[in-house]
């Protein structure tokens, strides 16, 4: 499950690169939304993996 948290974090960082960096001007809004969605998914998955271990 920790693997998924890392994957979601990487996807969020890539979305942030496109959304906040201004690389893809047409997709800025979508990239910003995806960034926050995947950050939330990464945090939730990380917390669930900690709860599963403990």
From Swiss-Prot:
Entries under InterPro entries matching the protein: DUF1328 (IPR009760)
Domain of life: Bacteria
Pfam families registered for this protein in UniProt: DUF1328
Listed GO CC annotations: plasma membrane
Subcellular location: Cell membrane
Annotated S-S bridges: none
Keyword field contains Transmembrane: yes
Main location, first listed in the record: membrane
Membrane topology listed for this record: Multi-pass membrane protein
Transmembrane segments: 5-25, 28-48
Keyword tags: Cell membrane, Membrane, Transmembrane, Transmembrane helix
Family label: Belongs to the UPF0391 family.
Record HAMAP family: UPF0391
Name of the protein described by the UniProt record: UPF0391 membrane protein Ajs_3511
Organism: Acidovorax sp. (strain JS42)
